[in-house]
């Protein structure tokens, strides 16, 4: 049959027209919408907008089923015009790029034509309407390397392209909106067959079956009865088919269904995804077996063999009692050893699916507990029909006999848990229908439905291979669309649907087995009968599945909750709280009362849980009646999420439209609309509704801990699956077993790593670590066949496969630009570019500064190549570049959910306030507000703790007694932070006097009565900009300043600056009000003062060394994983595919290698995500569409002189620019190549480490000029110019910045190199070769060789940086011990150097002391008088320095800990008795210590209790938080503190933290060893005994020696300290110090203004001193913790560092501005040269056991002056 012979491919004219041309509605929209919003727009553009919005509204009207008795036209019309045409304006906005306008539409009022949307700028050079030009501009690379930019107008074709895609999105989302319980309600299982949409679907699917059309009101039963029964012969079947008369099938653009009822899209997607793909991995449960001559599913059969009640209830192994576990063990043994034929048949398939799909199968194989007798990757369908023999049974028994019983139970549990998400579970277990239908001894089983659906979505290709077509409707090519319609509608076709022979639905093997009397010649007849019975039920099955999955909903406008005029008239008020209460009352009255409520509870299914709403457990809270509240009662009381604009029906449509068509989304929105809480919900729902993905995984980053926890709590509670619930036994909230929402930060987590559908909210550092290890966010395994040129195995080479770690990455609060965030956004671009099934969602309160950056940076991500692949846009030549990636979730024109009144100063008033007096002005304004208003809390923004302390004192002294001022900053305890966050609850019970609010609890001696305070003033740093929502907040006072800490890589110190805030920060502070009610914002500055202030990028403010050394690759011969040659998205490769297809010039078996040379690293991703049908030998399946393009090449024209209309219509510029100039290079296997990380071309980082000193071209990203930043010192600029050979700043105006060298990264890497963390090694081209021993095809081998030979040329003398072996192993130690304190490389070096001496725990103690008291004077007892200071100093002065003081202190504390058995916890096995005792009590529901209860409850809820590894999980879960009680330890510490004049509280803090960290180390090392011994890790890197390496390679000869004594422990501590901190050396100049590596002048810090002596215990300063840390205040550098050293010690301790410092002419100090200090240091360096020992250097590098660095050093020292060779 010729293509499309049955399809009428119509235009949009066929769509039913509710609003007709020039009718009253049409005129109204023209007059009141288009002409009002765009009054001066060109008439042709107005007409375009009007016609388009009419088309969209008609589509909505038709697709959502308006025009019926239940949903009359007037209902939709009222919805469109209520609230000042709010929804109509929202639809209009959805058709256009995002326009940042106000409520009055002032910008739109000025628009004259649509072309100007992209073009018009304001006086500041910013685009008036949209920033789309930044990702749409035309670019051309000039000969000088500069990129020229030409503006692209917004032409009509772009608008129409987007309109077509929008209409498709409406069809895709129709009748499936998120249930908001306002105007979107779930369709109930009990009455779906009464709905018009059901009846229309029945008619549609049967309208082609018979010439006598059936009445649309007939039920499915009636339509079935009206169909003629097929005759019993092939001839009669043929005659019956030929009698059918057909109409051609109408479609719009070959994909969109203009017929009533469920769309063909929904029908196909449900069949393909819900009924076939979703069940594939568990389908053995619906296999049929013959029992009493009838088919019985394996599930029902096994229910007779096992007690499935616990499994079906979702109870895990850990939740069974002993009798239940014994019973299950006995049942399994009986089943495993049974001689029953049916048992053996089921066992065979159980074994096969267990081997293939059990989550722990690989671990069991490594442990030799699961024995494989065949490859589980075999196709299951072959296995289904394998003949069961004694041999196969014996294989299965042998394979499973050693598998632990809990693993058997776990597999059953996992399989049933996933199976419970499917329609098959619903029909068998809930609907209690073992058979779907039966007639004349023919039974339709669930397995028959599966086979029908599988057959429907499969075909036999030209090679005779049975092949599955794409899963999604819009991924089907037109020929498959026709094939599917022929099958679904059962249209006779001699090729595609002929029932006289074996047809597409062919289950002959099944028929032979279950209908053995059927003759071979009658098989077509029997197939037809089965098919007909299935078709009679398929509509019901589809509806049941959509309802069961919780995605079929009914949008029915409800003016009583959405019409503001109606609400205002009903309540007689505009009060926000009264409005919310009225809405709650309406919801309760209409939906949640009486029978209506019962129907929704018992017959509506929740998409999240797959259960009815009555199965949601009540929310538990101490404040609820009887501590419980049912979910529907919660919805009608305390929540407001259902009313947020994010849940508005038009907002939802717009969201799903963007989600479906974009891989990167930029989401902004008004304050309180639900950006942080509702967007994640919509994404979770989109995965199920749009992606049909029941196992979607979303991760969302937050910049700080409070919003991480609060958002997880809020979202989970709003979803009805709270992560915490009140526990009456402990009178506290505890974690629940709900893991749909999870969270994690450094100190706490609520995570189930086995969960398959979740939203995980984490602090951004957590995700960054994961992304470093998972470059494409997919699964990866080591490639065992990868070798180098010499045949050595390369265990770091991997292959990357489908199966995402996360499907969606959300970066929330992105405007804050902390370093982790921007690195995530950087790494995410490469991940998403390669892995087209992942999405990046950037959520920000404001995007004014960032949007141009995002648009430029993510241009490379081509939305046309999103998975699922879209044949729809390919066939219709639509380009997703023509739709905007930005979504603004707000009512049109609104900036906040509630009204905010702004009060800015005039420019004259603003000029009076500066960094010296803003504190006083802030205090004054706050006092004025507090005294002039009567209710509502106040939030005052200050810059730091000192400001806050001053403000609290002043404000509390000058405000009424019912108002209390409290501080909020990051250093506060978690308890105090929680008090502030929940101040609306805690204020009434707050009883401190105002004067006492900052005292420690132990110092409180008096109290005010409860209820004294009714208002709070929160004085906060910028940490409150995004981390808290204060429910009673009415006023914000913003001083407009912030403290910024900036790292100076020249001086090597952090400087603190007080600077004006950015505009985005100002908007964030403003956004603290207007979230839950209206409020006022008082800015102590004019708008003009901040509007141009740009965000300070944290990555440019920090020391990037530690981050960069993690990112850099480990081996010089590690090549790019993906380069232009093997990039499936590279346009030249796509063009090559098209050419090969046209010329037929290829060998199918070699095709993918012929195209990409080396696709091996991501072969699986290419096969499954870049082909319509996974078959790399079939060139017709390659998805080559990348967007509109033609033969017109931009370079042929001068855009300023010619008409580019043809080019603009047919090309999106990125395609040609990328092909020629935008080549993609991914990271390497072990990290990034050095030149990519250095990024001198400014193309890798979204925010460059040197971003704060450069001005960029926003269109191209290229550097335009140097920026002078107030927070950057002159010395940095001097060095920068020196490196670039620029003598004067005036020369900058004449240089080409294309070749300008930025220095922050090179400086960081130089520092890392001196610490031997990285190496500079020769990068030889011949090294970049990987061979694969399992590739025997010579052609394929030649292609891979061609790939590696074609990588960018590296000259023989070129150098590249890689991780040192030391760094690689230090990373292993960091991973093993998992302590934040060791994330600093100085600390991990010190700790590691101490391991060979077994002093690492002593070193940890000293580290903790320094961490707790960064300023040494914090060790002094603060209660002692001034005169005691001298006594204290005299007592602790020593000649060996401050580290010696800490060592001595530790040696006095340690005996106390030993004497009181506080170090016994280090013996992990000692915990077994506690574990066993508390486990027994927990399972008996007896009270145990609360922390133990939390741990056991977590193990119980996650299924880890009562398992083989339960003690391992227990140990891993312990967080040892030592709390000092009033006991013997406390008394001994008190005596010690008194005797030593020490700060007792500081000692107690130290003991608590040390014991916690020390235990953590023992715990982690024990776990690491356990994992090795029990083979729990797949990654061989994790199976390495890292301690053995350290002990062997970091044991150096002593540098501190004594003539008569062996070095003692202090000597070893000192030696390890010098080795780790040898870069921190200063030369003592008497009254000041000079840093040895850069000549920075450092003045001694003083104990106090009363004691001007230097702040150190060192009383015998030597010429050279090591300091531990430094800071900078008021541009003065201070150093802390001083240790005297000898010159020889430091030269021998780190000979590499001092080799480069002394001999390297490119050292930084040689390029600094020559001052007296620099001269002094250079002279010092020259003077120490004779003392430097090259011999020691060689011995040192040899001992490090790193041949590469040994060769390098030997090579470099060749030719040095002989005087140094001693």
UniProtKB/Swiss-Prot annotation:
Keywords attached to this entry: ATP-binding, Helicase, Hydrolase, Nucleotide-binding
Domain Helicase C-terminal per the UniProt entry, residue ranges: 947-1116
Pfam family, one: Helicase_C
Annotated region described as Disordered, given as residue ranges: 209-239
SUPFAM superfamilies to which the protein is assigned, alphabetical: P-loop containing nucleoside triphosphate hydrolases
Superkingdom of this protein's organism: Viruses
Domain spans labelled Helicase ATP-binding: 656-865
Biased composition (Low complexity): 210-239
Top-rank EC class of the record's enzyme: hydrolase
Keyword Ligase assigned: no
Residue ranges annotated as motif DEAH box: 812-815
Enzyme Commission number: 3.6.4.13
UniProt-annotated binding residues for ATP: 669-676
The reaction(s) this protein catalyses: ATP + H2O = ADP + phosphate + H(+)
Gene Ontology terms for molecular function: ATP binding; ATP hydrolysis activity; RNA binding; RNA helicase activity
InterPro entries: Helicase_ATP-bd, Helicase_C-like, P-loop_NTPase
CDD domains: SF2_C_RHA
The family this protein is said to belong to: Belongs to the DEAD box helicase family. DEAH subfamily.
Descriptive protein name: Putative ATP-dependent RNA helicase R366
Species of provenance: Acanthamoeba polyphaga mimivirus (APMV)
């Amino acid at each position: 049959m010729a293509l499309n012979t049955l399809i009428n491919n119509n235009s949009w004219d066929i769509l039913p027209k509710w609003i007709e041309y020039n009718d009253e509605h049409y005129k109204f929209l023209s007059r009141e919408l288009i002409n009002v919003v765009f009054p001066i727009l060109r008439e042709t553009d107005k007409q375009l907008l009007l016609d388009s919005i009419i088309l969209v509204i008609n589509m909505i009207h038709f697709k959502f089923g308006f025009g019926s008795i239940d949903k009359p036209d007037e209902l939709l019309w009222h919805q469109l015009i209520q609230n000042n045409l709010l929804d109509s304006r929202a639809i209009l906005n959805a058709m256009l790029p995002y326009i940042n306008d106000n409520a009055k539409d002032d910008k739109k009022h000025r628009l004259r034509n649509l072309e100007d949307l992209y073009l018009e700028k304001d006086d500041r050079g910013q685009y008036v309407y949209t920033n789309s030009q930044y990702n749409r501009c035309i670019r051309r690379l000039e000969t000088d390397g500069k990129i020229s930019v030409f503006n692209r107008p917004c032409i009509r074709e772009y608008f129409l392209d987007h309109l077509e895609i929008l209409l498709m999105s409406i069809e895709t989302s129709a009748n499936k909106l998120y249930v908001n319980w306002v105007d979107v309600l779930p369709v109930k299982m009990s009455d779906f067959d009464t709905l018009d949409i059901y009846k229309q679907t029945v008619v549609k699917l049967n309208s082609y079956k018979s010439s006598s059309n059936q009445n649309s009101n007939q039920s499915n039963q009636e339509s079935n009865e009206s169909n003629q029964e097929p005759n019993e012969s092939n001839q009669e079947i043929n005659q019956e088919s030929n009698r059918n008369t057909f109409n051609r099938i109408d479609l719009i653009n070959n994909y969109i269904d203009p017929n009533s009822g469920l769309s063909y899209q929904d029908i196909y997607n449900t069949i393909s995804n819900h009924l076939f793909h979703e069940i594939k991995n568990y389908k053995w449960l619906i296999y049929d077996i013959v029992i009493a001559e009838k088919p019985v599913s394996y599930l029902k059969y096994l229910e007779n063999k096992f007690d499935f009640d616990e499994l079906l209830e979702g109870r895990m192994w850990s939740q069974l009692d002993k009798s239940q576990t014994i019973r299950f063990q006995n049942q399994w043994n009986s089943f495993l050893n049974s001689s029953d034929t049916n048992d053996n048949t089921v066992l065979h398939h159980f074994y096969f699916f267990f081997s293939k799909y059990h989550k722990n199968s690989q671990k069991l194989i490594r442990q030799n507990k699961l024995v494989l007798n065949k490859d589980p990757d075999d196709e299951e369908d072959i296995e289904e029909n394998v003949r069961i023999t004694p041999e196969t049974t014996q294989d299965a028994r042998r394979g499973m006999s050693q598998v632990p019983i809990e693993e058997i139970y776990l597999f059953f549990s996992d399989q049933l848990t996933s199976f419970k998400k499917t329609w098959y579970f619903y029909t068998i277990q809930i609907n209690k229908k073992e058979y779907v239908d039966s007639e004349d001894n023919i039974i339709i089983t669930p397995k028959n439905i599966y086979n029908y659906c599988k057959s429907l979505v499969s075909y036999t290709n030209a090679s005779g291979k049975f092949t599955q077509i794409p899963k999604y409707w819009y991924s089907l090519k037109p020929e498959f669309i026709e094939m599917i319609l022929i099958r679904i509608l059962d249209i006779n076709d001699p090729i595609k649907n002929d029932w006289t022979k074996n047809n597409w639905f062919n289950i002959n093997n099944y028929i032979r087995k279950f209908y053995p009397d059927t003759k071979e010649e009658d098989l077509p007849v029997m197939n037809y009968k089965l098919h007909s019975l299935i078709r009679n039920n398929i509509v019901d099955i589809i509806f049941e599945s959509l309802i069961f999955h919780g995605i079929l909903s009914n949008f029915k406008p409800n003016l009583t909750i959405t019409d503001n005029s109606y609400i205002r008239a009903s309540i007689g008020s505009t009060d926000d709280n009264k409005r919310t209460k009225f809405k709650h009352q309406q919801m309760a009255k209409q939906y949640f009362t009486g029978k209506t409520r019962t129907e929704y509870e018992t017959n509506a299914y929740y998409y999240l849980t797959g259960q009815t709403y009555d199965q949601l457990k009540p929310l538990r809270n101490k404040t609820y009646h009887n501590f419980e509240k049912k979910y529907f009662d919660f919805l009608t009381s305390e929540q407001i999420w259902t009313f947020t604009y994010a849940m508005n029906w038009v907002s939802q449509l717009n969201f799903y439209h963007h989600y479906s068509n974009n891989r990167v989304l930029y989401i902004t929105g008004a304050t309180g609309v639900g950006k942080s809480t509702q967007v994640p919900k919509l994404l979770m729902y989109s995965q199920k509704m749009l992606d049909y993905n029941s196992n979607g995984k979303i991760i969302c980053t937050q910049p700080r801990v409070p919003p991480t926890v609060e958002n997880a709590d809020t979202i989970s509670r709003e979803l009805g699956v709270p992560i915490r619930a009140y526990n009456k036994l402990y009178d506290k909230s505890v974690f629940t077993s709900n893991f749909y929402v999870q969270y994690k930060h450094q100190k706490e987590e609520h995570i189930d790593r086995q969960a398959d559908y979740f939203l995980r909210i984490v602090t951004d550092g957590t995700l960054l670590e994961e992304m470093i290890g998972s470059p494409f966010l997919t699964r990866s395994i080591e490639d065992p066949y990868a070798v180098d040129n010499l045949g050595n195995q390369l265990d770091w080479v991997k292959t990357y496969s489908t199966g995402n770690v996360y499907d969606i990455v959300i970066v929330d609060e992105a405007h804050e630009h902390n370093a982790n965030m921007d690195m995530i956004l950087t790494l995410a671009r490469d991940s998403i570019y390669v892995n087209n099934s992942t999405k990046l969602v950037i959520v920000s309160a404001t995007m004014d500064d960032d949007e141009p950056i995002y648009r430029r940076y993510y241009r490379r991500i081509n939305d046309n190549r999103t998975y699922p692949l879209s044949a729809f846009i390919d066939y219709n030549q639509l380009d997703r570049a023509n739709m905007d990636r930005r979504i603004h979730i707000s009512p049109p024109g609104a900036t906040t959910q509630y009204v905010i009144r702004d009060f800015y100063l005039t420019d004259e008033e603003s000029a009076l306030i500066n960094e010296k007096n803003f504190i006083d002005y802030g205090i004054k304004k706050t006092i004025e507000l507090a005294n002039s208003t009567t209710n509502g809390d106040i939030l005052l923004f200050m810059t730091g703790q000192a400001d806050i302390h001053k403000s609290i004192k002043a404000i509390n002294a000058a405000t009424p007694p019912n108002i209390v001022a409290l501080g909020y900053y990051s250093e506060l305890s978690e308890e105090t932070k929680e008090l502030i966050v929940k101040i609306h609850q805690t204020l009434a019970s707050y009883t401190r006097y105002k004067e006492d609010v900052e005292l420690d609890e132990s110092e409180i001696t008096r109290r005010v009565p409860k209820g004294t305070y009714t208002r709070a003033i929160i004085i906060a740093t910028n940490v409150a900009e995004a981390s808290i929502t204060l429910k009673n907040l009415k006023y914000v006072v913003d001083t407009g300043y912030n403290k910024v800490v900036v790292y100076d890589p020249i001086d090597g110190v952090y400087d603190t600056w007080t600077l004006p805030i950015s505009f985005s920060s100002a908007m964030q502070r403003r956004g603290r009000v207007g979230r839950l009610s209206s409020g006022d914002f008082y800015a102590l500055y004019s708008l003009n003062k901040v509007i141009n202030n740009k965000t300070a990028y944290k990555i440019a403010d920090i020391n990037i060394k530690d981050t960069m050394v993690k990112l850099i690759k480990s081996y010089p011969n590690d090549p790019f994983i993906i380069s232009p040659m093997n990039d499936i998205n590279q346009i030249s490769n796509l063009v090559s595919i098209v050419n090969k297809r046209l010329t037929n010039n290829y060998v199918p078996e070699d095709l993918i290698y012929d195209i990409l040379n080396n696709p091996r690293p991501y072969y699986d991703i290419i096969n499954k995500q870049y082909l319509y049908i996974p078959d790399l030998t079939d060139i017709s399946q390659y998805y080559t569409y990348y967007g509109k393009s033609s033969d017109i090449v931009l370079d042929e024209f001068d855009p300023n002189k010619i008409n580019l209309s043809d080019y603009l219509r047919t090309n999106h510029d990125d395609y040609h620019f990328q092909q020629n100039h935008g080549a993609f290079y991914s990271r390497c296997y072990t990290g990034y190549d050095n030149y990519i990380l250095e990024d001198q071309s400014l193309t890798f980082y979204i925010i460059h480490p040197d971003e704060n000193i450069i001005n960029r071209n926003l269109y191209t990203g290229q550097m335009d000029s140097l920026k002078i930043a107030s927070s950057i010192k002159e010395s940095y600029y001097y060095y920068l110019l020196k490196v670039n050979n620029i003598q004067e700043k005036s020369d900058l105006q004449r240089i080409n910045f294309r070749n300008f060298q930025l220095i922050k990264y090179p400086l960081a890497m130089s520092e890392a190199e001196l610490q031997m963390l990285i190496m500079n090694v020769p990068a030889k081209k011949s090294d970049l070769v990987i061979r694969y021993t399992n590739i025997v095809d010579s052609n394929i081998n030649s292609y891979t060789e061609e790939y590696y030979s074609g990588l960018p040329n590296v000259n023989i003398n070129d150098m590249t940086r890689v991780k040192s072996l030391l760094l690689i192993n230090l990373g292993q130690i960091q991973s093993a011990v998992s302590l934040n304190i060791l994330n600093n490389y100085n600390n991990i070096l010190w700790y590691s150097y101490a391991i060979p001496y077994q002093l690492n725990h002593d070193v940890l103690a000293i580290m903790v002391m320094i961490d707790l008291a960064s300023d040494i004077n914090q060790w002094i007892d603060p209660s002692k008088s001034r005169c005691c200071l001298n006594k204290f100093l005299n007592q602790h002065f020593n000649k060996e320095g401050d580290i010696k003081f800490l060592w001595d202190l530790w040696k006095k504390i340690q005996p106390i800990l030993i004497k009181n058995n506080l170090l016994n916890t280090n013996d992990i096995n000692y915990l077994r008795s506690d574990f066993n005792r508390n486990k027994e009590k927990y399972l008996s529901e007896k009270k145990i210590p609360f922390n133990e209860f939390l741990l056991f409850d977590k193990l119980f809820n996650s299924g880890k209790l009562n398992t083989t590894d339960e003690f391992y999980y227990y140990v891993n879960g312990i967080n040892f938080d030592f709390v000092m009680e009033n006991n013997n330890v406390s008394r001994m510490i008190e005596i010690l503190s008194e005797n030593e004049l020490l700060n007792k509280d500081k000692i107690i803090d130290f003991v608590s933290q040390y014991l916690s960290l020390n235990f953590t180390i023992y715990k982690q090392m024990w776990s690491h060893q356990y994992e090795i011994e029990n083979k729990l890790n797949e990654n061989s890197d994790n199976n390495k005994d890292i301690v053995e390496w350290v002990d062997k390679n970091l044991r150096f000869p002593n540098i501190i020696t004594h003539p008569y004594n062996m070095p003692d422990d202090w000597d070893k501590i000192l030696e390890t300290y010098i080795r780790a901190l040898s870069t921190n050396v200063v030369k003592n100049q008497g009254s000041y110090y000079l840093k040895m590596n850069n000549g920075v002048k450092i003045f001694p810090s003083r104990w106090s203004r009363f004691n001007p002596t230097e702040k150190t215990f060192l009383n015998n300063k030597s010429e050279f001193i090591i300091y531990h840390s430094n800071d900078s205040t008021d541009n003065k550098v201070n150093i802390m913790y001083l240790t005297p050293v000898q010159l020889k010690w430091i030269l021998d301790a780190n000979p590499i560092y001092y080799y480069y410092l002394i001999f390297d002419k490119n050292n930084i100090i040689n390029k600094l501005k020559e001052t007296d200090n620099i001269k002094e240091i250079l002279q010092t360096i020259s003077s120490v040269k004779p003392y430097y020992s090259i011999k020691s250097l060689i011995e040192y590098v040899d001992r490090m056991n790193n041949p590469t660095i040994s060769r390098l050093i030997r090579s470099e020292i060749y030719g040095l002056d002989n005087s140094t060779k001693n």
